[in-house]
């Protein structure tokens, strides 16, 4: 596979060396992140069968140009599918073309194939829809429910901040009002009925619930050759990457259906043995966005996939100022949860700071193949090594200082990478859950435990709705009791450790105090940022004392709390706060003059439009 750009979009081309082509249309928002490994797995399987496959991010999503709050995204998304079709047919030489869409991607694929909008109907031979969104209004209700479920678990300050969101926000992904209105108006059954032309064949893979049967009947009424299959693996597919599994049966169904429809010749059969050569790391793929340039790069010995975001007036041979490595959050691809990493990188580029957002092995596009089970990636030694390798790569380019940053598990990888490599001079850790991951502790066990700080639970005692949720969900109180007990023990143990340190005691490197001591000895500065009720502050309290006193004697560590910052940094206000703090830290610690103006510019920079970049057809 190799990176490509077209019309402001960034994607991947899996070369199958036959005349058969497939365009994979991803879903929107968090669903696109959660199903990224599914999209990649389908592409890899089809390429092994000799089919040329393109997958890409729509305008204003993923690594593509544009801000997700921009107007015109509905038309731009459909237009990007037309651009992809033209590219495969005209430049790659594909003759037989199938569109494959997942959830909202199936809706957009159908709209493009049916010729909705200003573009003439393209020549699409077949279409595959996995769990298709049929009625936009119902889809938006589902998204609202998902976000409301999350919002109900947050503090009053965060809920209040979300009431001021400029547009619909679903787990950090913004859906502007005109896109909401456009989606509300879509009913694929009506589209099928009125379309001047439709693909000749269609495969529907549908969960038990949904409007798939209605779409099936509408297609039959237009004479389309429709095959319907159940999507029994759906409940374990649409989950975050640490809990989801690849729907292997559904993937087999898609691949077999497409391959069976492809003409088989001796030349095609031979091509399947040599399909999709590995990317050699060379990339002429660059996205020029007025005041910055982004380039897909292969990083380090493991050839990690990354995006190097540089100010437009910077040349890689003459780097100046600091560079920042942005680690993955959990198993989300490098664009970040809620696309935070892209916002952060582009805000920094505007004030002269270069960033590298990477996929560690097993996440996004790094690694040999898409992983089925990604739960072992988070908090792994390999992830830490990959962040360290990315820092070494930037230092080898000549950047005088490299800083690593991340949220939650990304913060952990950044912190421990600084222990492993001298290339890192600073760490910005946002909502760091644990300073050290205990041996034998599984991610699944942690996910089943509490999701609040002890202080948060004391505040929740007065909220009858929280009590109701505990009873209805049959939550286990024991983790909360253990946390309260650990905080009580810390009132005694932390002062003892501080006294011992003054008389020469040295904590082990595999302990929280040992990690922070090692970084301080090497003159690595660290900024810790937490939401005011984030569970991670309990780990600070257990090992370093009360928040208001922790690190007060340290010249290398600063700690910030903010009531409007949620754990994953979904909110627009929290996003601006975190970006502002990061810019201040770079200005203060890195002595980088351009970044010194960032404290005042951060909120505006984070939200600026990319109006100068075309997000439609080029």
Describe these PLM feature segments:
Residues 1-20, 260-322, 571:
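N-terminal cap/lid segment of alpha/beta-hydrolase-fold proteins
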Residues 15-57, 311-359, 369:
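Short, surface-exposed "cap/lid" segments of acyl-processing enzymes
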Residues 38, 69-91, 373-396:
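Alpha/beta-hydrolase active-site loop
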Residues 57-72, 358-375:
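Glycine-rich "HGGG/HGxG" loop immediately N-terminal to the catalytic nucleophile
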Residues 72, 122-222, 226-251, 255, ...:
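The alpha/beta-hydrolase serine catalytic core
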Residues 92-103, 395-408:
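Alpha/beta-hydrolase fold nucleophile elbow
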Residues 100-110, 131, 405-414:
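Gly/Ala-rich beta-loop-alpha elbow adjacent to hydrolase catalytic centers
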Residues 235-288, 563-618:
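Catalytic active-site module of serine/aspartate enzymes centered on a nucleophile-bearing elbow/loop
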